[in-house]
Structures are given as C-alpha cells and as structure tokens.
Amino acid sequence: MESNLSGLVPAAGLVPALPPTVTLGLTAAYTALYALLFFSVYAQLWLVLLYGHKRLSYQTVFLALCLLWAALRTTLFSFYFRDTPRANRLGPLPFWLLYCCPVCLQFFTLTLMNLYFVQVVFKAKAKRRPEMSRGLLAVRGAFVGASLLFLLVNVLCAVLSRQRQAQPWVLLLVRVLVSDSLFVICALSLAACLCLVARRAPSTSIYLEAKGTSVCQAAAIGGAMVLLYASRACYNLAALALAPRSRLDAFDYDWYNVSDQADLVNDLGNKGYLVFGLILFVWELLPTTLLVGFFRVHRPPQDLSTSRILNGQVFGSRSYFFDRAGHCEDEGCSWEHSRSESTSMSGSLGSGSWYGAIGREPGWGGASQTRTTPLLFSQVPGPGSHHHSLYSTPQT
C-alpha cells in the first residue's frame, strides 16, 4: 500500500491537517456518541421485556438492527485510538463487518420504515377492499428482495476488494450505483407512503395514535429520512462521477467504506478523518437517532380513565408501538360508527333513565314522551350478538 501511496502523493510536502490532541478528541467524541446510542438501544430492548410487549415486532427488529449497527461503529472507532494500522489490515470477514455491514443495516432500517407505513396504508384500505391483503404480501416480498440484493452486492464487492480480484474503480462504480440507487428508490417509496398516510389522515390517525404517535410526527420523521438518505445517495453518485479514475482516494466520496481513506491518515494528515466523522454524524448517526426516538418503547397505559374504547378494546392516549398489530383493523368507518353509538349511549344515560330501561307510556304524569328508544333496543340483535355493558361498544 505504501508503494501505491508514494506513486499518488509525494510524501515530502505532507503535513498533519490537525494536531494529535484534536484527532484524539475527535476519536473519543465519535466513540462516545456511538456508545451512547448503543446503551440507549440496549435499555430500550430491556424495556420491551419489562413492559411485556411483543418480542417479535417491527419495533424489536428495528432496535436489534440499531444495536448491532452501533456496536460495529463503536468497535471501528475504538481502533483509531492506537491501532489504526491493524484496522487497515483486516481479513475479508472482519473488513466487511466493520466497514460495509453498518451500511447494510441502515438500508434494512429504511426498508423497515417503508414496510411500516405501507402496512398503515394497506390496513386503512383493507376495510373496503379485502383483496389489498394480497398486495401487502407482494410489497413485503419486493422490499425483502431489495434488501437481499443490497446485501449481496456489498458482500461481493467487499470480498473482491480485499482479494484484489477486480479493479477498484469497477467495484466502486457497481457498489455505488446499485446501493445508492436502492437508497433513492426506497426514499421515494417512503415519500409516496407518507403522502398516502396524510391523504387518509382520519382513518390512518387512529392506527398511528394507537401505536403511540400521530400523523404529523410520522410525516416529520419520514420526511427527514427521505431528505437525509436521498442527499447521501446524490452525494456519493456525484462525487464518484466527478472523481478521476487515477485518484480514487482523493476525497471521501466512499464515506461508508472508510478503509479507502483510513490508511492515508498517517500520510495525508487528519483532514479526511474529520470529514469522515462529520459525514457519518449527518448521514448515519442523525437519522438512526431520529428513528430510535420514533420506535422508542412506551410504557403501557395504567390509568383506564384516560383510555379510549375502540371496538370493545381499550386504548391509552399514548399506547406503545407495534405491540398489538390487530387492534386497528377497522379504522375510519368503524371508529366513527362506534363513536356515534357511544354518543347516543351517553345521551340516553344522561337523561335519567337506567341503561336498557323501557320508556314510559306517552302522557304519563302529564308529560309527553319525547325520548327515543334506548340504545340497547335500537338494533335487532343478530345471531352473533354479545352482551354489552356500559364499558363496551356494541358489536354490529
């Protein structure tokens, strides 16, 4: 590697871009940020067990991916305290785990975000169009296929790069084109899902609020993810197109594979290391932190007086994420229907009559009968009717 560097850059004119103390401080700051995120996600996973949430859900899968991602990034930056040369001479598997796998994990979190909002949209439409359930399976298969393609391309490029079996320019071109194109496609699909969620706000808001968020919060987080991931992909594609083939290591366009730049730290100074850290903060740490906050574990509602009744089931005003997937199958019309029935029931009870009591005869006691039939007898019970108490919504 030293011969390659000597042919590219003359060693006589090189001076450190940053003092050693600043470099050490940057390394400590990077490591501390990723370690803090690691312990935060680790605590969230323990809260899942403590609160008795579902162990396999969108939330737990996302948190597990973020935990692995933060652990790999923390391990990578820990090398830069004293053992930078060792980090640059890793075998194919450790090289891929530390440098390439975190990007794959980030793409998986983006597809997971897409799948969640696609599920929200499909569940809102499934009430009137039951065949939409088959479309949801097709969309899930498409995102799984995209994830596998992303993983396969990155693994092959990492192995070929370490074994020197292909030209570096060809490997970079293939990886950047495939990976960043998939990032852009997933970002655009996320934007489309957010538009559909916003258009169907009355029906989708019930599902989102039952999971501990709202349409505005989901749109804000999703919009930020679209901007961050799309800008990252555009940056990589533009920098690769503008970089000359004879000087692949001139700038940190390949920022998610820092091994192309890490072996230049001692020779070119630390300017590239500073740029790499800033880019990782904006395009890796920031979006992951936002998503961790979005998928955070909520405490189950304790006070039933602040809960709402929806189709015979109790929902807190801030119930937790992704733990009751079947609660809001019937949004929209069912919610409005149950709310109108609850209003009628409360009006009948508030008039002084016992729930289910038969109205008095007209003219009884000199007063005219103006009340309507109580709610209990407003509908003819079907063969599948259930007993309804004051705390359950009538099932139709």
UniProtKB/Swiss-Prot annotation:
Membrane topology: Multi-pass membrane protein
PANTHER family for the chain: INTEGRAL MEMBRANE PROTEIN GPR137
Family, similarity comment: Belongs to the GPR137 family.
An example Gene Ontology CC term for this record: lysosomal membrane
Disulphide bond pairs: none
Role played: Lysosomal integral membrane protein that may regulate MTORC1 complex translocation to lysosomes. May play a role in autophagy.
Record localization: Lysosome membrane
Source superkingdom: Eukaryota
Residue ranges annotated as Cytoplasmic topological domain: 53-60, 111-140, 197-217, 296-396
Record-given protein name: Integral membrane protein GPR137
Signal peptide boundaries: none
Organism: Mus musculus (Mouse)
Ranges of the Lumenal topological domain: 1-31, 82-89, 162-175, 243-274
Keywords attached to this entry: Autophagy, Glycoprotein, Lysosome, Membrane, Transmembrane, Transmembrane helix
TM annotation in the entry: 32-52, 61-81, 90-110, 141-161, 176-196, 218-242, 275-295
KW Transmembrane (keyword) present: yes
Residues bearing glycans: N4, N257
One GO BP annotation of this record: autophagy
InterPro entries: GPR137 (IPR029723)
